[in-house]
Regions:
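Structural scaffold elements adjacent to functional motifs in cytosolic proteins
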Residues: 52-54
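Rhodanese-like catalytic fold shared by cysteine-dependent sulfurtransferases
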Residues: 2-10, 19-38, 43, 50, ...
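Hydrophobic helical h-region of N-terminal Sec-dependent signal peptides
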Residues: 13-14
Length: 132
């Protein structure tokens, strides 16, 4: 009986151990950085080769947007990002109106493998130039 229990325990530990190790790992999950509008503006002034991504709807973009911003509505990121943003290591600065949709867009970009995503909230707090 004791030999049988040892065998059962050994088999259980052999099967359970890999699951225990995998379950505790975060898998090296990536994330995006949340920065202020002033920090985003400083990056725009000092960096080159970045993308400004407006995550709002077309009518909102038409009413006014940050100069040079491209429009990809937050709910279209999964469908359009790979075509519009081919370099997954490029600096991508994401905004929307208030910050809610830009967070969703930034999360989706990270899920798609983008590695240099910065979310800076909404245009309602943007204190710099806007074009129509």
């Amino acid at each position: 009986m004791l030999k049988r229990n040892k065998r059962f325990l050994l088999m259980f530990l052999t099967l359970a151990l890999p699951f225990g190790c995998v379950g505790c790992s975060d898998g090296g999950s990536a994330s995006y950085d949340q920065i202020s509008g002033a920090e985003a503006k400083a990056l725009m002034d000092s960096e080159s080769g970045y993308i400004i991504l407006d995550a709002r709807e077309q009518y909102e973009y038409d009413e006014g947007h940050i100069p040079g911003a491209i429009l990809i509505p937050y709910d279209k990121i999964a469908d359009c990002a790979e075509k519009e943003l081919p370099d997954k290591d490029q600096l991508i600065l994401v905004y929307c109106r208030s910050g809610r949709r830009s967070k969703i867009a930034a999360e989706e970009l990270v899920k798609l493998g983008y590695t240099n995503v910065k979310e800076f909230g909404g245009i309602i707090d943007w204190e710099y130039e806007i074009v129509k």
